[in-house]
Amino acid sequence: DTLTVRNLTASAYGASFYGGGTMKGKTLDFNVFGDKIYLAPWLKDYADVHGYLTAEGHLSGTTDKPIFEGNIGSDKLRINGTVLTNVRGSVYVDPTVVNFKNLGFDQGEKGKFVLQGGMTLTGEHRLFGYATMNDGDLTSLTNLAGVKLHNTTGLINGRVDLGGNLKNPDIALKGTIDDLTVGDHLLGTSQVDVALQNRRFTVNTFQVPVGDGMLAAAGHADLDGKTDIQIAANKVDLSLLLPITGKEIPLTGNLNFIANVSGETRNPKVELSADMTNATYNGVFVDRVYAMATMEDKVIKIQQLVGQRGQYKSKIYGDIPLAALYTSSYLPPGDKSAMDLVVDVNDEDLAVLPLMTPNSIALSSSRLRNSLKKMLKK
């Protein structure tokens, strides 16, 4: 027996659906159109999505396994606060999978994306496919991922490969960040090749030009295991990067450093060697500051932190527990959370010390022969 339906009208969550066709036994053969489909109630278990969608296509398969193939579109969608416009593409949907084909959308002033792929609708909700990006807005995309950047803009070009599942996605990004700008400073083009797979974050390439210098990183960090990452800076002008912090920090200088991060990701060990030249802090000039330090068990151990101005040097060494940096209360001598530092000034110009001390103690410019050991309190 064949059931013929003409001018079918239905509604759900404020959306209107129209169709016509036949059903022979359990076999479906309908042309359907959906208008003003508000996505929030349909996708609330997957993402924070707001906006209206239209869908037009063919409904086939059976009543046990209906299949929709057609085209979808939206003038404007908002996903996790990021606005996407001119959403257009093809889609295949059955009870087990949703698969987008050539799903294009615009983002920002000139960003264009095309998605090929989708997600299984049963079991672990597996992700598959890839997306290409052309001039994607960096700030909007980091907001989409829940990451907030301060005073930083750029255009992402490249490809993102998707895998894993909805709760534990695999994401691989390879491309460039063009016109990377921090504050008012155009840094240039950054090379990026990073991946997140089974909660293991891998940095194959990360290079950021900073003036005449370069900031780079490589390695991996298992979110449930160990870390092995190297970060390096060569001739980096600090004044070009500090706007990222979102704070006014009166610090300038050319920085070189190598940092090795290893051990447990949740409690890593850090080995740092750094050198800064032509540094100023609050108008105080220092020829050179260099340091060797480690961090282990959440305690920074300074082997040496030396500030040099002309023929004079000041030295700091000792321990800084991370807890001391996050408290505003008084820590008595002997408290394991308190800083324990030695400040060695031997015939020195003490004006270099504000640049070296962790709580930026302001000292007048003078000379002193002495060795001081004291507990520095936040």
Q: What is the role of each PLM region?
A:
Residues 1-260, 266-365, 373-378:
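Interface amphipathic segments
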Residues 370:
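Acidic, contiguous internal or C-terminal segments within carbohydrate-active enzymes
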